[in-house]
């Protein structure tokens, strides 16, 4: 009997697609409309695919198959983000070269993806570890190295939009005369300090016990190495940085035109952290009043300088209206002014504090919950608005990488400053008070009434007297204790004082960003080598000057190494490479040494979407004409975990290439969708009291008493209960809850968790494909619910869609025959009106659902069609063939088999998508629900377009409705044509 047999059908069609290169997009520029659909390509781990991967891949595959059938040129590709830590860690443990491990893992991933029938153009496949690929990763890095950002340059791009700020060739950087006069080396150092790719001393995670630098993800929250649980300390190493901060404004503002989820846009904006405020200089020169006054007079003449000198500490604040409340200053321990500001008697304390701060991560330092620590430098600064001298402290909650690395501390109006002031008994001066309407003021102590004063500038408001603050007041209000600004509303005060500071030459309006430059180097082997030479002096020591590797010498290929053990020092692993790779001498005798850091895993994934459009080009990273045709990516689907870093880094690289004229689009990804997570199957837990009696989960809460040895307790008594793991046959669904089969009053706890090895709930797609077939897996993952939502796995759900595919097969195939042939009910007869209506409604609904990425509802429509047609004694071929085309994007193997059975000799991959006829969808009658007091009690059929009177009359005459109305008083009848009839009744 020719039953539906996925294990026979699917390998057959996968081989057919491979042999006929069905989904290959020919090289060159095609005619017609394009559709570039891209998955976030995976890291090929040793674990292979899990069932979460195919969710996004199936969604993009449906879109691509649908687009091909619409006649569009589709670019749909797959590759491998294959540099990374796991392969190198495996090499350290086993001695197996990372390349061997990576290639083995890629082979497994490719096998799994092909078994799922995705319509990738495999001729464009590449891995970021391919030298032919990372040659161009290195080339793009050199474009960053060759670029400086002209913040004042106004220009119009190929998209017709005018922007301010542009990346320009380093050769166009204006060189000051004094730098030119100092010679070539000085000019080169000046250029190096302005490049988008530059070197800078940055703290890294150094583990002495392991003898290596660790990535942040390899360090636990307790500051220990993930491997071995060894102490990790922070050390400064010279690192490569990318000046992403230069593009902060454009990265933030140009999100607006992208079709991305609002949540992702918000995450990126928050990460960039744009804020409006003011820069203010606090005087640290002569401690005398005369010195301060002389400085202010000079500033009034010369204005606010672009860069601060040694006489000031420059701060950035979003609340210039609180300047009068600054009672101390805080510098980051790494601030360059700390050494000269620290007095002799404070030197030992400051040095020890800086040493301890250097051991902490930025995350630990800025943790709001941690105890505030700090040390006084012994020096003072003068507040420019009131001449008050305030002490200068250092504290680790201030980061040198944010703002200016110095803050004015206003403890009355900032939570961290308040906690610090309380810890060290520093003054707290309130300078902003809340504005309270007189009608809402309640004064219990009538003696306080004499202290209330009216605010003439805000009629109806009063000033509430200052009381000792129990916490920082961080809201807006009006100014107090702020000299001539008293009484001004916060927003007005901000505007006024920014202008006054500018006029006095001690401050100015400013924009700041939380975003920091991108630390771009790693001390690893398995990453792209930097295409950079360091120049050495005659003794072999670095001169501090660097030069780019010539384009003709790219790629700089990773050297063959057998020893992947850490060096035991902060030197990168590549420092152990053979000398013939490490060193060279130029024709004019300059000694060179290669950069021995490697690029991070992010590098290769920053631009892979460009290479897919032209993967075999040996002359350019992408042909200009192909870039113009294929870019931007029309639909990009991937996990929300990449919402910030990967997407931000890709956008940054793309904008630099855009500025340099290498690409014509300002953004890489026009539409972004984050698929939801597929969770493990729900875990069912019941609860028993001390007597073994079942209690409802609704009467139980998690135990918060550490002294009690129990995970859960009774909500009302706090007595412990025992959690019991239940099996599926012990429970049943009742409404929104799961209950015990033996006692339906007992609600059990049902929770789905992220799939993980530790929970033992990981599902391997190979197992599903083997048992049910790839089409069932694809269909189930799309049927689980909306694409963007998290959804729990259910084997019964897989079984359900498998049965649906079996029904679709039987609808067309005669399972009673000895060989596969059409069901006798399938006939070459014209469809009747009802059959045409079912078909065209399904065509319309499925197409619209695919356009909206609402795949679960599209599948529901096809299930409805199958149920309706299966009930027909005669099934016109004219409605079945279009249905097979609708099914094709979702279950392509089955669709191809049925298409062939209908006598077609070529793949349906490029068959035209069925078109619906609006005239065939209209019905002569429509079904309208009838409600009694808002609850549906019956349904009636009325002519299409029936008016209110017809609706009411038909409903009143319906026997079912009459039964519900009997003995009741009809107060009102609401009839909405085409929608509903509602009887409002009494009695």
Predicted features and spans:
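Residue patterns forming the tRNA-binding/recognition surfaces of aminoacyl-tRNA synthetases
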Residues: 3, 16-20, 94-313, 406-549, ...
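Flexible, glycine/threonine-enriched loop-and-boundary segments that flank and lead into catalytic domains
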Residues: 263-314, 359-388, 392, 518, ...
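Helix-rich, typically C-terminal accessory recognition domains appended to large enzymatic cores
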Residues: 81, 152-159, 193, 198-205, ...
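Basic, alpha-helical terminal appendages of large translation-related enzymes
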Residues: 1-34, 332-335, 344-347, 427-444, ...
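Catalytic alpha/beta core of large soluble enzyme barrels
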Residues: 60-61, 73, 335-435, 470-472
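Long, charged, mostly alpha-helical binding arms that flank functional sites
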Residues: 4, 277-279, 433-461, 466-468, ...
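Conserved oxyanion/phosphate-binding beta-strand-loop segments in alpha/beta enzyme cores
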Residues: 1-38, 68-77, 101-107, 260, ...
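N-terminal catalytic cores of NTP/NDP-binding nucleotidyl/phosphoryl-transfer enzymes
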Residues: 26-102, 126-137, 317-318, 322, ...
């Amino acid at each position: 009997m020719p039953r539906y047999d996925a294990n026979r059908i699917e390998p057959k069609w996968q081989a057919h697609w491979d042999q006929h290169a069905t989904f290959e997009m020919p090289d060159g520029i095609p005619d017609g409309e394009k559709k570039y659909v891209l998955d976030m390509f995976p890291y090929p781990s040793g674990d292979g695919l899990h069932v979460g991967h195919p969710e996004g891949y199936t969604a993009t595959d449906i879109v691509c198959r649908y687009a091909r059938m619409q006649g569009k040129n589709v670019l749909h590709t797959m590759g491998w983000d294959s540099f990374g830590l796991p392969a190198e860690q495996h090499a350290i443990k086993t001695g197996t070269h990372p390349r061997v491990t990576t290639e083995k893992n890629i082979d497994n991933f490719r096998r799994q993806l092909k078994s799922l029938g995705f319509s990738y153009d495999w001729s464009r496949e590449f891995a970021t570890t391919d030298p032919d690929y990372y040659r161009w990763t290195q080339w793009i890095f050199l474009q960053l190295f060759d670029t400086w950002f002209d913040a004042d340059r106004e220009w119009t791009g190929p998209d017709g939009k005018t922007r301010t700020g542009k990346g320009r060739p380093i050769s166009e950087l204006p060189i000051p005369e004094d730098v030119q006069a100092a010679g070539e080396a000085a000019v080169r150092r000046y250029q190096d300090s302005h490049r988008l790719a530059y070197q800078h001393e940055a703290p890294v995670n150094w583990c002495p016990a392991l003898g290596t630098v660790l990535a942040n993800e390899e360090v636990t929250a307790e500051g220990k190495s993930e491997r071995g649980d060894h102490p990790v300390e922070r050390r400064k190493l010279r690192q490569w940085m990318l000046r992403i901060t230069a593009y902060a404004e454009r990265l933030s503002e140009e999100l607006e035109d992208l079709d991305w989820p609002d949540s992702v846009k918000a995450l990126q904006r928050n990460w960039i952290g744009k804020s409006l405020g003011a820069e203010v200089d606090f005087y640290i020169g002569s401690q005398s009043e005369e010195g301060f006054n002389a400085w202010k007079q000079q500033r009034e003449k010369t204005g606010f300088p672009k860069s601060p000198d040694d006489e000031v500490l420059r701060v950035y604040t979003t609340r210039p209206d609180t300047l009068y409340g600054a009672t101390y200053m805080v510098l980051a321990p790494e601030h360059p002014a700390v050494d000269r500001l620290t007095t002799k008697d404070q030197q030992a304390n400051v040095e020890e504090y800086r040493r301890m701060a250097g051991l902490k991560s930025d995350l630990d330092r800025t943790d709001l919950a941690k105890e505030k620590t700090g040390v006084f430098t012994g020096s003072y600064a003068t507040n420019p608005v009131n001449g008050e001298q305030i002490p200068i402290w250092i504290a680790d909650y201030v980061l040198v990488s944010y703002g200016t690395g110095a803050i004015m501390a206003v403890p009355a109006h900032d939570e961290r400053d308040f906690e610090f002031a309380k810890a060290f008994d520093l003054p707290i001066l309130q300078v902003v008070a809340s504005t309270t309407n007189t009608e809402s003021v309640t004064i219990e102590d009538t003696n306080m009434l004499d202290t209330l004063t009216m605010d003439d500038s805000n009629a109806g408001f009063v000033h509430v007297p200052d009381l000792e603050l129990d916490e920082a007041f961080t809201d807006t209000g009006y100014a107090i204790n702020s000299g001539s600004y008293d009484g001004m509303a916060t927003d007005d005060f901000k505007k006024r004082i920014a202008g006054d500071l500018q006029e006095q030459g001690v401050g100015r309006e400013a924009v700041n960003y939380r975003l920091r430059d991108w630390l771009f180097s790693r001390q690893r082997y398995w990453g792209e080598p930097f295409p950079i030479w360091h120049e050495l002096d005659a003794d072999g020591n670095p001169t501090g000057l660097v030069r780019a590797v010539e384009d003709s010498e790219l790629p700089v290929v990773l050297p063959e190494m057998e020893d992947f053990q850490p060096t035991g020092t902060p030197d990168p692993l590549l420092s152990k490479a053979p000398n013939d790779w490490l060193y060279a001498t130029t024709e004019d005798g300059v000694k060179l040494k290669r950069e021995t850091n490697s690029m991070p895993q992010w590098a290769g994934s920053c631009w892979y979407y460009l290479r897919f459009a032209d993967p075999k080009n040996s002359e350019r990273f992408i042909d200009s004409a192909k870039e113009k045709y294929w870019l931007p990516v029309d639909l990009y689907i991937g996990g929300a975990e990449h919402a910030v870093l990967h997407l931000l880094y890709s956008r940054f690289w793309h904008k630099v290439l855009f500025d340099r004229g290498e690409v014509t689009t300002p953004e890489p990804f026009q539409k972004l969708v984050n698929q939801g997570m597929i969770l493990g199957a729900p875990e069912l837990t019941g609860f028993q009291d001390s007597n073994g009696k079942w209690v409802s989960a609704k009467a139980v809460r998690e135990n918060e008493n550490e002294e009690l040895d129990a995970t859960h307790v009774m909500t009302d008594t706090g007595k412990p209960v025992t959690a019991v793991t239940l099996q599926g046959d012990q429970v049943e669904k009742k409404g929104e809850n799961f209950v015990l089969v033996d006692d339906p009053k007992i609600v059990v706890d049902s929770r789905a968790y992220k799939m993980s090895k530790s929970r033992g709930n990981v599902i391997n797609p190979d197992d599903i494909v083997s048992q049910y077939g790839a089409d069932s897996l694809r269909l189930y993952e799309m049927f689980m619910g909306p694409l963007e939502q998290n959804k729990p796995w259910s084997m019964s759900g897989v079984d359900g869609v498998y049965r649906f595919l079996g029904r679709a097969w039987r609808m067309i195939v005669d399972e009673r025959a000895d060989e596969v042939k059409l069901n006798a009910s399938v006939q070459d007869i014209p469809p009747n009106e009802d059959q045409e209506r079912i078909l065209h409604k399904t065509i319309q609904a499925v197409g619209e659902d695919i356009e909206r990425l609402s795949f679960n509802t599209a599948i529901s429509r096809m299930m409805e069609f199958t149920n309706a047609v299966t009930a027909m004694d005669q099934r016109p071929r004219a409605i079945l063939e279009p249905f097979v085309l609708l099914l094709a994007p979702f279950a392509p193997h089955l669709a191809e088999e049925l298409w062939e059975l209908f006598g077609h000799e070529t793949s349906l991959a490029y068959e035209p998508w069925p078109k619906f006829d609006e005239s065939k969808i209209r019905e002569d009658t429509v079904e309208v629900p009838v409600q009694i007091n808002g609850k549906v009690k019956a349904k009636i059929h009325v002519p299409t377009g029936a008016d209110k009177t017809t609706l009411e009359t038909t409903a009143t005459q319906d026997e079912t409705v009459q039964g519900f109305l009997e003995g009741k008083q009809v107060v009102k009848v609401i009839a909405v044509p085409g929608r509903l009839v509602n009887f409002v009744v009494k009695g």
